[in-house]
Every structure is written in structure tokens, then in C-alpha cells.
From Swiss-Prot:
Binding sites annotated in the UniProt record for UDP-N-acetyl-alpha-D-muramoyl-L-alanyl-D-glutamate: 32, 34, 160-162, 188, 194, 196
Name of the protein: UDP-N-acetylmuramoyl-L-alanyl-D-glutamate--2,6-diaminopimelate ligase
InterPro entries according to UniProt: Mur-like_cat_sf, Mur_ligase_C, Mur_ligase_C_dom_sf, Mur_ligase_cen, Mur_ligase_N, MurE/MurF_N, UDP-N-AcMur-Glu-dNH2Pim_ligase
Xref: Pfam families: Mur_ligase, Mur_ligase_C, Mur_ligase_M
Species: Vibrio cholerae serotype O1 (strain ATCC 39315 / El Tor Inaba N16961)
Short motif Meso-diaminopimelate recognition motif, span: 414-417
Keyword vocabulary terms for this entry: ATP-binding, Cell cycle, Cell division, Cell shape, Cell wall biogenesis/degradation, Cytoplasm, Ligase, Magnesium, Nucleotide-binding, Peptidoglycan synthesis
Length: 495
């Protein structure tokens, strides 16, 4: 990536440097993590949510940083400059609040058009459907989110759904230099609240739904909803595409007069809209007859589940809002493919079907089980766990949903982290009406094996919670584990 800027230009909005030698220093790369510093990098030291980066200034310099930008405090006021081992450290007030703009001034200036997708569930599917559709229409498109960053056939792993502000701007610049005309970003509530996408300009923003998640961070559903809404209210967002079947979305469109409403149920009362007249679900996919501000049509795509019908409509509305032809979109829709680890079907004759899905919230689990019930001629199995060191309140809810919408329930582990797996499952069992009917097997592979051994050929087994993930986080280690590989191995399928 070929980027460079004089420090005086980069920090001009916040500080004027009077030392000409210092002002002429050139920045080529910004880095928040001292462990990743390479020779010539600029270390950005801020007061983080968990760690104070200023504690690692000396380490970053030892690693080769040629300049440090540090968050000002009572001891080091805005504009204060000190030298450590001959390396200048410049202190800036509220540096953490300016990261997105700072990175944009270094990495910006590209023509990569950005689409932000927010919501509790569906972000990964919607971003990847949009990117797939754009590629089918001849436009090079990338994604950034849970399953990785980059082009769909070569995603690079990402640590978080929404990376830090510096990573996002640098990645967008890199993708643009590699030919990306569009990038669809999953914009998490954490990323929005922490200002990681603050200075990005979105040609479209999409809201999928809101249900219980991340309350260990946000505290209340109201705060969680406000975080999501900020994509439309506090960020540069040209088009707002809102699922009005969601109660929160129905309220939001009243505050967004130019919003595009999307519904599987009824015609939205919005300036522009798209809504389903009839939806047919089959194992071969979804057929959706719709009306819209762009005319009526019929869409067929090889995805399953009511929520995927909604995801398809949201993706379609997004691309229509950007000026793409309806006829071209409908003609290419049958070539869309399910997303890795999202309602992904594994099957073999005379065996129960196994479906891997990322559903790890009560709402997502219910939707996944409801979707599979339509296709299940036998018994529906749910293999479900809950993460450790996360929202304990949803554990009994997850178990209750599994009991209500599945015929057979197996409680298992899903990244127990530092917590006791037995304690996590005990929290889940508290939500069961008939706990004696549930089977407990902490090892996920053994849980899936048990289900397949006891399931009939007409049964469907849902492995919920991990989706694309290929690891299990335990107390002191992270081990390799994949539900997808488990399904392939148990059904003796070629990977």
C-alpha cells in the first residue's frame, strides 16, 4: 500500500506544529498494537477500553516506531512533545475520538463505495449477498466482517466483526488498490459506539433486525438499539434500507423520512419500499414475488428460511437504491450461493441431514429452527451451547427456544472461555420445562455424533452457534474445532 503524509498535514485539524523538522516527518503507516509495529511505523497510543496504549510507547519505539502519537492527559497536555530514545512523542487531546478521521486523512481518497450493514442477525449474509450480486453484475466487490475481510474467494481472517478505526481505513484503501469498487461492511454496535466507522461515507446503510445480544456491553436494549441507529443518525449514510417487520425498524423509519422500507408482510409506509406479495419455501430455495418502488418481480435464489427471504429483499433493495437494474438483479439471483456456515446443509442418502448455522442468540436460534421445521419430515434436533464470559441472561432463553422449537435438544459447549462448562450448561438447563428430556454432551463432536446415531433418515440436526468458526475457546487455550468439518466427517463427505 503506497501511502504517506507529512505529520503536519495529518494532524492539522487538531494541532499546528511549529518545529519545521518535526513537521516534515513522514507517516506511512499507523498502528495501534505495539506488538505489530515494524520499522518506520507510527505508533498511536490511546486510552483503550481495556488497555492504556501509552504504557507500550517504549516497547513500540524499541520495535522500530519512528514517531508516536499519544492521547493527551493531565500530565501531557495537547501539543506537548517529548523525545524518548530520540523518537518524538506528540500528545493530542481526545486522540481516541479522532482515529477514524486521522486514518482517513492518511488512507482515504479512494473510490471504494461503502455499504454498511447493521443488526443483531443477518449482517454476514446480507453483506455477502450484496457482494456476490455485484460480482455477478460485473463489479469487483469485497466484504469486511465476521468471516473475514477481502474478496469472497480469498477472505483474510478478522479478529472482530468491525476492526479498529485504523485497520478499517487501511483495509479499505488496500481493497481499493486491488480493484474493489464496492465494499460491504458489517457495522457492529461496538464499532459504532466506539467511533470505528465515524468518518466513513456510506452510499447505503442496511438495518436487518434487533434482538437480545451484547447486553454485557451495552447494559440495556435501549442503549443497544441507539448504537445501531447511530449508523443512520450520526454517520454519513446516503440511503437507509430498513426492515420494517422488526419492531425497532418500524419505529426508526418514522425518524428517517427518506428511508426505504422492506417487508415480507405488508407495504411499508415509507418514501420508497419493497414488499413481498407471496413467498414459497422449498429445499431448492426461495421464490419471492414482490412489489416495489422499482416495479414488481419474481426472485428465485437457492437459500432456505424466512429470514433469508428478508435478507434477500434487503440486499435487493440496497442494490436497487444504488441504481442497478431490476431485470439484471433478478436474472442473476439464481446464481447466488448460501454463505459459509449460515444455514449450510450437509446431506447423504439414508442419513439425517445436518445443518450448520451461526445462530447464537435466542432470536436467531428460533428463526433457524422455524426455517428448518418447514423442510423436516421427521424429528428436528437442536445442538446448542452458550459462550462463557458473556451475557448470562440469554442462556436459559437459548435452551427454552431449543426446547420449544425442536423435538430433541442436546446442550453442549460453545467457547466456554474462563467459565466452567458445567456452570454454563446449568444456567441453560434452568430455562428448560422438561430438563430430563435434554441430553448433555459437552464435547461438540460427540454431541453431533450422538445425534446422528439416534436420528432417523428424515430427521434434521441443527448444529447452532459456531457457523464458520473453526475453533473452540477453552480456559487456557484455543483448540481447532469446526461444526462444518464435524458434519462432513460424520456423514463421510469430501471436504
Amino acid at each position: 500500500m503506497n501511502t504517506h503524509s507529512a505529520i503536519s498535514e495529518l494532524i492539522a485539524p487538531w494541532l499546528e506544529l511549529t518545529d519545521p523538522k518535526l513537521a516534515a516527518l513522514v507517516i506511512t503507516h499507523l498502528e495501534l498494537d505495539s506488538r505489530l509495529i515494524k520499522s518506520g511505523d507510527t505508533f498511536v497510543a490511546i486510552q483503550g477500553h481495556a488497555v492504556d496504549g501509552r504504557q507500550f510507547i517504549d516497547k513500540a519505539i524499541a520495535q522500530g516506531a519512528n514517531l508516536v502519537l499519544a492521547e493527551a492527559d493531565a500530565q501531557h497536555l495537547n501539543g506537548w512533545v517529548e523525545y524518548r530514545a530520540g523518537v518524538p512523542v506528540i500528545y493530542l487531546a481526545e486522540l481516541g475520538q479522532h482515529l477514524s478521521e486521522l486514518a482517513g486523512r492518511l488512507y482515504g481518497g479512494h473510490h471504494n463505495q461503502l455499504i454498511g450493514v447493521t443488526g443483531t442477525n443477518g449482517k454476514t449474509t446480507i453483506t455477502q449477498l450484496i457482494a456476490q450480486w455485484l460480482e455477478l453484475l460485473g463489479h469487483k466487490a469485497a466484504v469486511m466482517g465476521t468471516t473475514g475481510n477481502g474478496f469472497l474467494n480469498a477472505l483474510e481472517p478478522a479478529a472482530n466483526t468491525t476492526g479498529n478505526a485504523l485497520q478499517i481505513q487501511a483495509t479499505l484503501r488496500d481493497l481499493a488498490e486491488r480493484g474493489a469498487q464496492y465494499t460491504a461492511l458489517e457495522t457492529s454496535s461496538h464499532g459504532l459506539v466506539q467511533g470505528r466507522v465515524k468518518k466513513l461515507h456510506f452510499v447505503a446503510g442496511v438495518f436487518s433486525n434487533l434482538s437480545r445480544d451484547h447486553l454485557d456491553y451495552h447494559g440495556t436494549m435501549e442503549a443497544y438499539a441507539a448504537a445501531k441507529f447511530s449508523l443512520f443518525s450520526e454517520h454519513a449514510c446516503q440511503n437507509a434500507i430498513i426492515n420494517v417487520d422488526d419492531a425497532v425498524g418500524a419505529q426508526w423509519v418514522k425518524q428517517l423520512p427518506q428511508a426505504i422500507g422492506v417487508s415480507l408482510v405488508t407495504k411499508p409506509n415509507t418514501a420508497q419500499a419493497i414488499w413481498a406479495r407471496e413467498v414459497a419455501y422449498a429445499e431448492s430455495g426461495i421464490t419471492l414475488n414482490f412489489e416495489s418502488s422499482w416495479g414488481e418481480g419474481e426472485l428465485h435464489a437457492p437459500l432456505i428460511g424466512e429470514f433469508n427471504a428478508c435478507n434477500l429483499l434487503l440486499a435487493l433493495a440496497t442494490l436497487l437504491s444504488l441504481g442497478f437494474e431490476k431485470s439484471a438483479l433478478l436474472a442473476t439471483a439464481p446464481k447466488l450461493r448460501p454463505v459459509l456456515g449460515r444455514m449450510e446443509l450437509f446431506q447423504r442418502e439414508q442419513k439425517a441431514k445436518m445443518v450448520v448455522d451461526y445462530a447464537h442468540t435466542p432470536d436467531a436460534l428460533e428463526k433457524a429452527l422455524r426455517a428448518l421445521r418447514v423442510h423436516c419430515a421427521g424429528q428436528l434436533w437442536a445442538i446448542v451451547g452458550c459462550g462463557g464470559d458473556r451475557d448470562r441472561g440469554k442462556r436459559p432463553m437459548m435452551a427454552a427456544i431449543a426446547e420449544q422449537f425442536a423435538d430433541r435438544v442436546i446442550l453442549t459447549d460453545d467457547n466456554p472461555r474462563s467459565e466452567s462448562p458445567q456452570a454454563i450448561v446449568a444456567d441453560m438447563v434452568a430455562g428448560l420445562t422438561y430438563p430430563e428430556r435434554a441430553h448433555i454432551e459437552h464435547h461438540r463432536f460427540q454431541a453431533a455424533s450422538y445425534a446422528l446415531q439416534h436420528a432417523g433418515a428424515q430427521d434434521i440436526i441443527l448444529l447452532a452457534g459456531k457457523g464458520h468458526e473453526d475453533y473452540q475457546v477453552l480456559a487456557n487455550e484455543t483448540i481447532h474445532y469446526s461444526d462444518r468439518e464435524t458434519a462432513q466427517q460424520l456423514l463421510e463427505l469430501q471436504p
